[in-house]
Amino acid sequence: MARSVAFGVAVSEEILGDGASVPIQGGIADGMATAAALGFDCVELHLRNPTEFDATALARLAAETGLRIAAIGTGLEYSLNGLSLTSDDPVIRERAAARMRQHIDLAAPLGAVVFLGLIRGKCGRRARLADCLDRLAEQLAPLAAYAAERRVPTGIEPVAYYFSDLLNTTAETIDFLRRPGLESIGLLLDTHHIHLEERDIEAGFRNCAGRVTHVHFSDSNRRYPGAGAVDFARVARALDAIGYRGAVSLEILPSPSGEEAARRGLARMRELWVPRAGTRAANAPTTAGSGL
């Protein structure tokens, strides 16, 4: 029986520094070659500007390295470009939405998930939280339709309180996605955030059955799995229980170095799945959440 999940790692074009949770930085081509040499099945690409990349060239690079491009991350649009779907400035909101469409366009021919984390923005004031969520839903509904038309799976990420005050728990996120026009959006689940925000990390994953489009493995201290307090065995059990068949990707700090963090993280993931399964994963993404 084939292993149920594909092992992935985050790669960026830019050098983001030691404080960024992307272990392989400084070039997509070189980063994918490194990921392949380390033994990963797939990568997620963290892109500041999707229009700088050609899908055909990326597909060729994937074929050359034997890797699948499992996902495209949009967080750099917020952290480096200052774009937010809930900004008070309507011009910034529209620029953020336009960039999301460009990420979706790039992902479509690659069969990649597009996930949404920090680009949701922050509200900043509890009294305005309902208005901020309404604004986010207003921006996401047309993007969900745009992604669904192009058959691009997507996921919004519940994030810890120190990242954003919008959608911290799985329950909040699932409830938000019940709004009209958002039903096709899936969830990206990150063990670091779930560990901080959920009373029971395994239950947090199980509650999202049928909606999970991508998974991040990151320990409680944002380092590689095994460097902190997250019980990854419980997470692996939960993912198997809900029938998740997508990528499990390392979005971790590059400590003690990017390659070493990735190597140690991959070793821990193999401990969790390979003894119970056996062979290299079939690189087939989950079909849940074909919209943003």
Model regions: which residues?
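N-terminal pre-domain/capping segments
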Residues: M1-A108, A267-L292
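Acidic (Asp/Glu)-rich catalytic clusters
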Residues: M1-R3, M32-A37, E52-T74, Q102-G111, ...
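Active-site beta-loop-alpha junctions enriched in small/polar residues
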Residues: A10-L16, H46-R48, T74-E77, I119-G121, ...
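Active-site acidic/histidine proton-transfer and metal-coordination neighborhood
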Residues: V22, G26-G27, L83-G186, T279-N283
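Acidic-and-aromatic substrate-binding clefts and catalytic sites of carbohydrate-active enzymes
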Residues: V22-I24, L45-A57, C123-R125, Y161-L167, ...
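Conserved, mostly hydrophobic/aromatic
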Residues: A35, V43, A62, A96, ...
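Acidic/histidine-rich catalytic cores of soluble enzymes
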Residues: C42-V43, A137-A236
